[in-house]
A protein has these predicted regions:
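Positively charged n-region of N-terminal signal peptides that target proteins for export
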Residues: 1-4
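Primary mode marks residue(s) on the alpha4-beta5-alpha5 output face of response regulator receiver
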Residues: 23-233
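Sec/Tat signal peptide C-region and signal peptidase I cleavage site
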Residues: 17-21
Length: 233
């Protein structure tokens, strides 16, 4: 079943470039200067730590974005990794309308990966970031991710893992903005029917990204009292 789904995803991706070729380059979105995606390091560290509860983030490894990609600025001891994702971490396949978030330099999405997700999922987001920083289009990013996964250059996802996204200072981009504090569940091959078929954007568990693929993400909103405010030290 998994091999079939991967094959279907690869076939779907194969048709994307043809559609893009019909759109003139003048109409295609453009990347802002990379400097617009960057932050002062103290502010980024504080924002990254706001991704999860203090008992997690205070002992987590912290990564920040540089012109060379994400780099470790603090080594933790609990296996969690916190960082601030940018629009580069947009869905690879669906919802299609959010794939262009790669061009939105305002996105700031603090996240704290659990130890399993730090090993299996974070490299996927770091690859997406690398490709976007090379000015690849969403379709070229999809092709790069597919190829890397097929070659075994990205970890295979053999089970569910999760991440906290509890920051009160999150900006998830145009059309979403500031959403509920939530838990990201990385659930390979899930679709929305498997979590109740809830409406996208509702304050209920839902499949948010890349349904039916190895990169599927379920989001589970939590109480607003759990929001964590970024505090620079």
């Amino acid at each position: 079943m998994r091999n079939t789904l991967i094959h279907l995803a690869l076939l779907a991706g194969a048709f994307v470039p043809a559609a893009v070729a019909q759109t003139s380059k003048s109409q295609a979105p453009k990347y802002p200067p990379i400097e617009e995606y960057l932050m002062p390091q103290p502010a980024e560290i504080a924002l990254a730590k706001s991704g999860g509860p203090a008992n997690i983030s205070d002992r987590a490894t912290i990564k920040v974005l540089t012109t060379s990609g994400f780099t470790v600025v603090h080594q933790g001891d609990n296996g969690f990794v916190c960082m601030v994702m940018r629009g580069f971490s947009a869905p690879t396949y669906t919802p299609a309308q959010f794939r262009d978030l790669v061009y939105d330099s305002s996105v700031r999405a603090p996240i704290c990966f659990d130890p399993k997700a730090a090993k299996e999922v974070m490299p996927y987001y770091e690859l997406r970031t690398k490709l976007a920083m090379e000015r690849k289009s969403p379709d070229e990013i999809t092709e790069g991710v597919q190829a890397a996964y097929a070659r075994g250059e990205l970890p295979k996802r053999d089970g569910v893992s999760f991440a906290y996204m509890w920051s009160a200072d999150q900006n998830l981009g145009s059309g979403i903005g500031h959403w509920h504090p939530h838990v990201m569940v990385f659930a390979p091959y899930y679709d929305n029917s498997m979590v109740g078929g809830n409406t996208f954007g509702a304050p209920l568990p839902q499949l948010s990204d890349d349904a039916g693929t190895p990169f599927a993400v379920v989001v589970i909103p939590v109480d607003h009292n759990l929001f964590v405010k970024a505090e620079a030290k």
